[in-house]
Swiss-Prot record:
Organism the protein comes from: Mus musculus (Mouse)
Domain PPIase FKBP-type: 31-121
Phosphoprotein keyword on record: yes
Top-level taxonomic group: Eukaryota
Role played: May play a positive role in AHR-mediated (aromatic hydrocarbon receptor) signaling, possibly by influencing its receptivity for ligand and/or its nuclear targeting.
InterPro entries: AIP/AIPL1/TTC9 (IPR039663), PPIase_AIP (IPR056277), PPIase_dom_sf (IPR046357), TPR-like_helical_dom_sf (IPR011990), TPR_rpt (IPR019734)
Name used for this protein in its record: AH receptor-interacting protein
Spans of repeat TPR: 179-212, 231-264, 265-298
Keyword Hydrolase among UniProt keywords: no
Subunit and interaction comment: Interacts with RET in the pituitary gland; this interaction prevents the formation of the AIP-survivin complex.
Amino acid sequence: MADLIARLREDGIQKRVIQEGRGELPDFQDGTKATFHFRTLHSDNEGSVIDDSRTRGKPMELIVGKKFKLPVWETIVCTMREGEIAQFLCDIKHVVLYPLVAKSLRNIAEGKDPLEGQRHCCGIAQMHEHSSLGHADLDALQQNPQPLIFHIEMLKVESPGTYQQDPWAMTDEEKAKAVPVIHQEGNRLYREGQVKEAAAKYYDAIACLKNLQMKEQPGSPDWIQLDLQITPLLLNYCQCKLVAQEYYEVLDHCSSILNKYDDNVKAYFKRGKAHAAVWNAQEAQADFAKVLELDPALAPVVSRELRALETRIRQKDEEDKARFRGIFSH
C-alpha cells in the first residue's frame, strides 16, 4: 500500500485513508464494477462541498476500462478495498474536466439527458469557449481550475460477469444485445405481479434503444427500425403505469405513439382506459370507438370497458346529486 500511495503522490494525487477496507485489494481488471459514494470538495481551507452523491439517493457506479471522462476517478478507486473510506487531493491536471462531468452527473440525477448542452463539441473546446454549464459553481470552477478533493466510500466491487450492466455503461453492441433480454425480464416480472420492477426493466430497454436512436438521422430506415422496437416496450411500460394508476403518464406516452402510428390499437385502448380513469368520458369513448374501427374482434372487451365507464359515471352523478342535496338542505 505504501508503494501505491507513493506512486499516486508522484502523479499529483495525495491519498489519505480514513477507514481501512476489507480483504485483499481487488485486481480491478477491465469490466470490474466499482460502486461508491463520493463527495467533491474545494481544496482551500474551507473545504466546501461541490457535489455529494448521498444527496442524490444513489451511489456512483464506474466500470473499469470504459474510458470514463474523468480518468483520475478510475485511478483512485482502483487503489481501494470494499468498505474503505479515503480522501484524494488531486492536482489541477487531473480535474480540469470535472465541471463537465459534474454537469452530466447532475443531469442524470435530475432525470435529464446527461449530454444536454454538450453535443457536437469536445470537452476541451467547451472549456476554451467558457460557455455556461448552467450551474454557477461549475462555471466558476471551469474558468478558474483548482485542485480538488474527492472523498470516496467504496461500497462494493464486482468482477466482470457477476453483475448486469446499467444501460449507460454498455457499448452500442451490448445495448442492442441486451434489449431482448431486458424485455423478457420485464415480462416475467409483470407476470409475477412485480409491476414496479417490470416498469424499471422496460424503462432500461427503452433507454438503450433511445440512446442508439439518437445516433441515427430522424426518419432514416435505421431510426424507424429502432422506433418500431421502442413502441411495444413503451406500451408495456404504459400498462405498468395503468396498474400503478399513473394515468397522465399513460396519456402522454400513448399520445406520443399515436402521433407517429395512428393505427396502433393497443395505444388507443390504453389511452382510452386512462381517459376513463380520469373522467375524460368523451375522449375515452372516442378512443374505444377507434379500437373497434381498427379491430372489430375486440368488441367484447371494448363493450366491457364502456359499461364500466357508464357505471362509474352514473355512480358519480348520484354521489354529486346527493352532495348537492346536502348542501342546499342547510
